[in-house]
Amino acid sequence: MSADPTAPLDAGPELAALLELARTAAAAGAAVLAGRNTAGLDVSNKGDSGDWVTAFDLAAETAVRNVITAARPFDTITGEEGGTVLPASPSGYRWSVDPLDGTTNFIRNIVYYGTSVAVADPDGVWQAGVVNAPALGRTYYASRGNGAWLEEQGRRTQLFGPAAGRTGQILATGFSYDPAVRAEQAAGLGSLMDGFADVRRLGSAALDLCLVADGTHDAYGERGLNEHDFAAGALIAEEAGCWVRRPRLTSPLAGGPSDDERLSAWTCAATLELSGKFPL
């Protein structure tokens, strides 16, 4: 008798298998990015000025999808470039993939970019997430209830977020490609920075969240993100013990989210003491 593809996974070994698959898939995407060469970028614009896509975005997403589909053919995959693909008999599990978070950085050879892969269970709860940053030589990962981890130069380190109350606290944020939205964000930056010593804008939401998890940033907050931008990084920050706010966006399975819904929603991560710094 064959296994029911819609049956829920067991919490223990099956969760470990999900994380391992996420790691393998993210590594496949990152391997594509590691082959970066200027001649092969093939850059085009997706609409908003500065919202770029390259041949590497597309190839990395294909690599990630191939790994996931080979192992779990009944899972749904939502990717930044390829949208949502439903299998004939969906298991209820859904993967969220950003093959190249930080495309502008990648084009300009700025090292803050990577492949982000996360998976949610049939209830929509994120279970495992990985951000693989090949130019940094870092892989951040987490599974629900098992902490957040960094692998770098063969060493594995558990992450516990930033130290509370330290001096010189740094806020990370980002800005929209849309000039009108960006002007609003810039106008509110002064009040958002109240109490922080400095601000950073790295250009990769996934890595900003991971840098809160590893204690580099004290806080990160940005509105207007897509699910694939925050899915893995938010889980990693959460499992590192950080306070995290994810947008409550309409699922891609229900045709969402709308631009208005997305642009009004904040994604945040910080120590609990800094949670009140961000708009509701």
How should these model regions be labeled?
Residues 40-44, 196-200, 243-245:
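Short secondary-structure junctions
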Residues 1-100:
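N-terminal subdomain of lithium-sensitive/metallo-dependent phosphomonoesterases centered on the IMPase/IPPase/PAP
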Residues 1-24, 183, 187-194, 207-280:
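Oxyanion/phosphate-interacting regions
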Residues 29-33, 57, 68, 103, ...:
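Residue-level signal for inorganic ion chemistry
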Residues 70, 78, 85-151, 235-238:
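Active-site-adjacent structural elements in enzyme catalytic cores
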Residues 46, 80, 202-204, 247:
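Conserved beta-strand termini and adjacent loop/short-helix elements that scaffold enzyme active sites
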Residues 118-209, 252, 257-280:
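Acidic beta-strand-loop-alpha-helix segment within the catalytic core
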Residues 76, 128, 170, 218-219:
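Short, Asp-centered acidic motifs that coordinate Mg2+ and/or phosphate
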